[in-house]
Amino acid sequence: MDQFIQLVEASQVRNDLPDIHPGDTVKLQLKVIEGEKERLQAFEGVIISDKGMGTSKTITVRKISNGVGVERIIPLCSPNIESITVLRKGKTRRAKLSYLRKRTGKAALKVKERKVFTPSK
């Protein structure tokens, strides 16, 4: 039975998503259905946690909107995710960045930037 579940999960996992970690600043394009219309809604913020693995993996994204902190828990295998763009790579020493909830203003989104090395030819 366990092998069957793994086989089904392997066929459902999305491979088109970038490599993301807590501390990264991302921009999500989410499909929103209102009545009969469908549109894309952007949600830009810092990943403060990720949880689970495989098809049950979720991320928590936090942003400050009009001075109020807004968090969204998003399942990564959701068909409502159109795209995920990594705007900044964050350098963190923690897996859960819940301490960002206590901060206000610009400090609420401040995470050190990770240096990304590209091989030179």
Curated annotation (Swiss-Prot):
SUPFAM superfamilies: Translation proteins SH3-like domain. GO terms for biological process: translation. One of its GO terms (cellular component) is cytosolic large ribosomal subunit. The keyword Ribonucleoprotein applies. Keywords: Ribonucleoprotein, Ribosomal protein. The keyword Magnesium does not apply. Belongs to the bacterial ribosomal protein bL19 family. This protein is located at the 30S-50S ribosomal subunit interface and may play a role in the structure and function of the aminoacyl-tRNA binding site. This is Large ribosomal subunit protein bL19.
